[in-house]
Swiss-Prot record:
<dbReference type="InterPro" id="IPR017871">
    <property type="entry name" value="ABC_transporter-like_CS"/>
</dbReference>
<protein>
    <recommendedName>
        <fullName>Ribose import ATP-binding protein RbsA</fullName>
        <ecNumber>7.5.2.7</ecNumber>
    </recommendedName>
</protein>
<keyword id="KW-1278">Translocase</keyword>
<feature type="domain" description="ABC transporter 2">
    <location>
        <begin position="252"/>
        <end position="495"/>
    </location>
</feature>
<dbReference type="Pfam" id="PF00005">
    <property type="entry name" value="ABC_tran"/>
</dbReference>
<comment type="function">
    <text>Part of the ABC transporter complex RbsABC involved in ribose import. Responsible for energy coupling to the transport system.</text>
</comment>
<dbReference type="InterPro" id="IPR050107">
    <property type="entry name" value="ABC_carbohydrate_import_ATPase"/>
</dbReference>
<dbReference type="GO" id="GO:0015611">
    <property type="term" value="F:ABC-type D-ribose transporter activity"/>
</dbReference>
<dbReference type="InterPro" id="IPR003593">
    <property type="entry name" value="AAA+_ATPase"/>
</dbReference>
<dbReference type="GO" id="GO:0005524">
    <property type="term" value="F:ATP binding"/>
</dbReference>
<keyword id="KW-0472">Membrane</keyword>
<keyword id="KW-0677">Repeat</keyword>
<keyword id="KW-0067">ATP-binding</keyword>
<comment type="similarity">
    <text>Belongs to the ABC transporter superfamily. Ribose importer (TC 3.A.1.2.1) family.</text>
</comment>
<dbReference type="GO" id="GO:0005886">
    <property type="term" value="C:plasma membrane"/>
</dbReference>
<dbReference type="InterPro" id="IPR003439">
    <property type="entry name" value="ABC_transporter-like_ATP-bd"/>
</dbReference>
<keyword id="KW-0813">Transport</keyword>
Length: 501
């Protein structure tokens, strides 16, 4: 079968880093090509070379059989290559229709915007995706999952021959994911080629026909998905066997460290639970259940309206994140790019940002040598892949950014570490490293709250699990009691079992 798009022998280097070396990718009509690899394997760089954001150092790009070079995203888009980025590219203050047709609005014969036609066309695109809202709604009023669907509608509006989807289901619910897969199958039947970049093995085996594997910037293999197993695909990605996906540390927790009684706040209603020293408490639930809101109330990022929190026997009041940090509670956000990291700053500056008091002299000046030593130690301990600590953190892969975010939290020497979706957007190899770090923190007596939408992760890593449903606690289970079935039953409100200590 002749490929719609072919990239062969692609090289791309940056100062101190060879991002791509002999990389290759084929996209076929009517087929979904998965592009997989650990974070830092070169997937994003390849997409930027393809769409003309980066100029390739070597190699060829064939589009519809002809050698081509795109000068930027506009030229690749006009040629018929659409891309849906992992980071949303929408304007919250505009309506859905205005976002979809931004820069190419429908105009009438008087040169004025034809709003009626524009909204009608946008509504048709939303209907194709089986969405329940109209296109006159403001994008800022939508959930992250619904905003992602608007991004997909925007690309569909270009009638692209090849559509690149970068982690498209990262923020989608199961229902939204099913809608997306239905649309992908429709696009396949129309002869379009799709590049599907994802870390989610289940999705790759469900929706993709072929898979291309990258490792360390190099092309490893192109295979039909049907010829592979999850294990064999992961082994190709990481270059080694993954014996134990979730390395649980079997060590009994200590005394109660954190006690939460009848906590209320925005999206949180009357929640009570305990957390022990050296314990990993998993927090499960569906999107919108109030898990993140609970953590933010606890940490001080959202206001507490009632309830009590005690830490090591002393009552704690957190009116701001600064109060949370001062009391030894650290929150690592699920949205590391918005809440967690300053992308234009260096690895060193990001890592030490909240711990500068430990590196400050009485007069306020910094002990730079101490700061550099601490950052260097964490880079080594966490195996952060970066050319130097002065590298801008925005240039690191997702897994390495997440390690820096966690290291920054630990630099403040916390008693309670809240990890909200710590492995979201992180590849299988980096996930294992993060799990091993979590176990190390547990062994050191740190109390950890692990919020995750991935049930196997919660089940595999936690000593005890609480489940949220519509702002309430709907279940509490020991490691032995917990199964995917009971967690899901509690998450949808069908089961209510809370064992308070």
């Amino acid at each position: 079968m002749e490929a719609l798009l072919q990239l062969k022998g692609i090289d791309k280097a940056f100062p101190g880093v060879k991002a791509l070396s002999g990389a290759a990718l084929n996209v076929y009509p009517g087929r979904v090509m998965a592009l997989v690899g650990e974070n830092g394997a070169g997937k994003s760089t390849m997409m930027k070379v393809l769409t003309g954001i980066y100029t390739r150092d070597a190699g060829t790009l064939l589009w519809l059989g002809k050698e081509t070079t795109f000068t930027g995203p506009k030229s690749s888009q006009e040629a018929g290559i659409g891309i849906i980025h992992q980071e949303l590219n929408l304007i919250p203050q505009l309506t859905i229709a205005e976002n979809i047709f931004l820069g190419r609005e429908f105009v009438n014969r008087f040169g004025k915007i034809d709003w009626k036609t524009m909204y009608a066309e946008a509504d048709k695109l939303l209907a194709k995706l089986n969405l329940r809202f109209k296109s006159d709604k403001l994008v800022g009023d939508l959930s992250i999952g619904d905003q992602q669907m608007v991004e997909i509608a925007k690309v569909l509006s270009f009638e692209s021959k090849v559509i690149i989807m970068d982690e498209p289901t990262d923020a989608l619910t199961d229902t939204e994911t099913e809608s997306l897969f239905r649309v992908i199958r429709e696009l396949k039947s129309q002869g379009r080629g799709i590049v599907y970049i994802s870390h989610r093995m289940k999705e790759i085996f469900e929706i993709c026909d072929d898979v291309t594997v990258f490792r360390d910037g190099q092309f490893i293999a192109e295979r039909e998905v049907a010829s592979l197993t999850e294990d064999s695909l992961i082994e190709m990605m990481v270059g080694r066997k993954l014996e134990d996906q979730y390395p649980h540390l079997n060590k009994a927790p200590g005394d109660i460290r954190l006690k939460v009684d009848n906590l209320c706040g925005p999206g949180v209603n009357d929640v009570s639970f305990t957390l022990r020293k050296g314990e990993i408490l998993g927090v499960s639930g569906l999107m919108g259940a109030g898990r993140t809101e609970l953590m933010k109330v606890l940490y001080g990022a959202l206001p507490r309206t009632s309830g009590y929190v005690t830490l090591d026997g002393h009552e704690v009041v957190t009116r701001s994140p600064q109060d949370g940090l001062a009391n030894g509670i650290v929150y690592i956000s699920e949205d590391r790019k918005r809440d967690g990291l300053v992308l234009g700053m260096s690895v060193k500056e990001n890592m030490s940002l909240t711990a500068l008091r430990y590196f400050s002299r009485a007069g306020g000046s910094l002990k730079h040598a101490d700061e550099q030593q601490a950052v260097s130690d964490f880079i080594r301990l966490f195996n952060v892949k970066t050319p130097s600590m002065e590298q801008a953190i925005g240039l690191l892969s997702g897994g390495n950014q997440q390690k820096v975010a966690i290291a920054r939290g630990l630099m403040t020497r916390p008693k309670v570490l809240i990890l909200d979706e710590p492995t979201r957007g992180v590849d299988v190899g980096a996930k294992k490293e993060i799990y091993q770090l979590i176990n190390q923190f547990k062994a050191d007596g740190l109390s950890i709250i692990l919020v995750s939408s991935e049930m196997p992760e919660v089940l595999g890593m936690s000593d005890r699990i609480i489940v949220m449903h519509e702002g309430h606690l709907s279940g509490e289970f020991t490691r032995e009691q917990a199964t995917q079935e009971v967690l899901m039953a509690a998450a949808v409100g069908k089961l209510n079992r809370v064992n308070q200590e």
